[in-house]
């Protein structure tokens, strides 16, 4: 499911939750941007496509990105499920965002094994072999440090 997390920014962080070694991690979900079209998929960067479209010409349309390099450890106190149910009182913009998030979530569910495997691989490469993966290490957050910080505030 999609979840949101409070941040210092004006909007919450939106992402999916996975388990890595018993620790919950949020993988940030980024809205589609033009710059993503020419970027190649990498171990820490997963493109989300509109595969549910009835129109084949849209099946390769990028509708979001999962940034594994920016996944963060979280605890239950900061996780809240996002309501994606369409409501007749929603504004047109809110309806459009919900439909996009429904498509993104559907794609993530269909590709959950790949997402989990890649996230675990990125985590392992950064925490176990940082010197062998310097470019990846530069792009990624420090998972160990973030886990230590979270443990100071965590009660679950």
Regions found by a protein language model. Give the residues of each.
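C-terminal terminal-subdomain/extension
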Residues: 49-156
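Short, small-residue-biased leader/transition segments that mark boundaries at the very start
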Residues: 2-10
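Compact nucleic-acid interaction/catalytic patches
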Residues: 19-62
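Conserved catalytic-core segments centered on acid/base and nucleophilic motifs
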Residues: 13-19
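General N-terminal targeting signals
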Residues: 10, 34, 41-43, 83-91
């Amino acid at each position: 499911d999609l979840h949101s997390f409070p941040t210092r920014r004006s909007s919450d962080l939106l992402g999916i939750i996975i388990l890595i070694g018993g620790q919950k991690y949020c993988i940030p979900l980024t809205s589609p941007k033009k710059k993503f079209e020419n970027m190649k998929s990498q171990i820490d960067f997963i493109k989300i496509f509109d595969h549910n479209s009835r129109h084949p010409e849209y099946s390769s349309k990028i509708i979001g990105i999962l940034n594994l390099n920016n996944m963060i450890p979280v605890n239950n106190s900061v996780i809240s499920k996002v309501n994606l149910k369409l409501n007749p009182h929603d504004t047109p913009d809110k309806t459009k965002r919900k439909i996009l998030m429904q498509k993104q979530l559907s794609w993530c569910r269909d590709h959950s094994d790949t997402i989990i495997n890649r996230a675990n691989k990125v985590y392992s490469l950064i925490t176990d072999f940082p010197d062998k993966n310097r470019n990846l290490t530069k792009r990624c957050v420090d998972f160990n440090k973030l886990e230590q910080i979270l443990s100071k505030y965590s009660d679950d």
